[in-house]
């Protein structure tokens, strides 16, 4: 003998309590003798009954809305985390730390994007900033990041990676609805490639240059003018990556979006990022995780927690060591290896 268990729909259960409250109020009004009286006491009791029923209905609706909002945030948080996924603490000998904050309250991901991928061509990183901020920019972030994650493995040349990103952005803008102001859409992008020997090459489309931390010295990685941002203008024919020196063992790169340096205090003063970095490493070099924590704490103090734009930070430190040949005049070159500290990527 089979038993079929019928499940009552959740919506029916949710409506049961307010329906019962409403029925109780109507029954009281129509059937209770006290409700038919016109005395002051009867009026007070009747008002109290209807007030209690109304309060119960309001609380029930509020609880249902809060529960639904919590579920929506959980789904949105999972989707956003899949889009801008947490980076592993170590990538091919590099110690990595990253964090971002959306200007839209309740959104985990905004218009800033970053990714670091180990490939056969070297460690490749991207840092970008979509025009606008918050949830409205997520579609463009998804298009650029998706193209980057595929292109870095397929393309041996960094210039061809950038062209793939440009084509992905162009497709995304063309697929937007006619009501969106796609003519004003643009994305700043910084592409970096760090070879096994620490050699850095870069392509920069309108993005702030990162800072290079060597011991307690802080300086920009490059000072050349970047290319225009992706979107408004076509890329030039020649996309030769710019050599930017070497990331030696112990050196760090600090990538950031313009929301960091554009953050203002109550008096309208901009955040002095280079000075903050110099203060962070004044005594001794610190880990990427500590750099990110220190900078975010300084930003919160500077703006009093009122950021007007999305902000993102990405720190890469070369934890590889070099092995030199012991015998003088021995043939061969130094080979990069890695050691095994156990850093954390949690802030």
Regions found by a protein language model. Give the residues of each.
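Preference for bulky hydrophobic residues occupying beta-strand positions
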Residues: 98, 125-128, 192
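Primarily the active-site beta-strand->alpha-helix module of PP2C/PPM metal-dependent phosphatases
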Residues: 107, 113-176
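Acidic, Ser/Thr-rich low-complexity segments on the non-lumenal side of membrane proteins
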Residues: 81-119
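Short alpha-helical scaffold segments that flank and stabilize functional sites
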Residues: 79, 83, 147-150
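Conserved subregion of the PPM/PP2C metallophosphatase catalytic domain
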Residues: 1-77, 81, 88, 113-122, ...
């Amino acid at each position: 003998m089979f038993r079929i268990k019928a499940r009552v729909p959740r919506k029916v259960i949710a409506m049961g309590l307010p329906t019962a409250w409403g029925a109780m109020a109507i029954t009281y009004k129509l059937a209770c003798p006290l409700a038919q009286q016109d005395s002051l006491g009867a009026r007070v009791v009747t008002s109290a009954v209807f007030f209690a029923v109304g309060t119960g209905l309001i609380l029930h609706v509020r609880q249902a809305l809060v529960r639904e909002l919590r579920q929506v945030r959980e789904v949105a948080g999972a989707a956003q985390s899949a889009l801008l996924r947490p980076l592993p603490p170590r990538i091919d000998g590099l110690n990595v730390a990253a964090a971002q904050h959306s200007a839209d309250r309740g959104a985990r991901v905004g218009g800033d994007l970053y990714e670091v991928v180990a490939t056969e061509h070297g460690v490749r990183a991207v840092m970008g900033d979509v025009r606008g901020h918050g949830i409205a920019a997520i579609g463009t972030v998804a298009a650029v990041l998706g193209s980057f994650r595929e292109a870095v493995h397929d393309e041996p040349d960094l210039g061809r990676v950038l062209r793939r990103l440009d084509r992905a952005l162009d497709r995304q803008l063309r697929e937007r609805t006619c009501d969106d102001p796609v003519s004003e859409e643009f994305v700043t992008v910084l592409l970096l490639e760090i070879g096994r020997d620490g050699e850095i090459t870069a392509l920069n489309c309108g993005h702030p240059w990162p800072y290079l931390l060597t011991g307690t010295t802080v300086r920009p990685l490059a000072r050349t003018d970047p290319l225009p941002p992706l979107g408004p203008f076509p890329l030039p024919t020649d996309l030769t990556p710019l050599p930017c020196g070497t990331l030696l063992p112990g050196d760090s790169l600090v990538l950031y979006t313009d929301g960091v340096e554009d953050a203002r205090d109550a008096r309208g003063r901009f955040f002095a990022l280079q000075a903050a970095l110099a203060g962070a490493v004044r005594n001794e070099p610190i880990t990427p995780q500590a750099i990110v924590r220190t900078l975010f704490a300084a930003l919160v103090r500077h703006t009093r927690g009122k950021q007007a734009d999305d902000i993102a930070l990405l720190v890469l430190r070369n934890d590889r060591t070099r092995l030199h040949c012991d015998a003088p005049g021995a043939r061969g070159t130094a080979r990069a290896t890695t050691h095994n500290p156990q850093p954390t990527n949690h802030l």
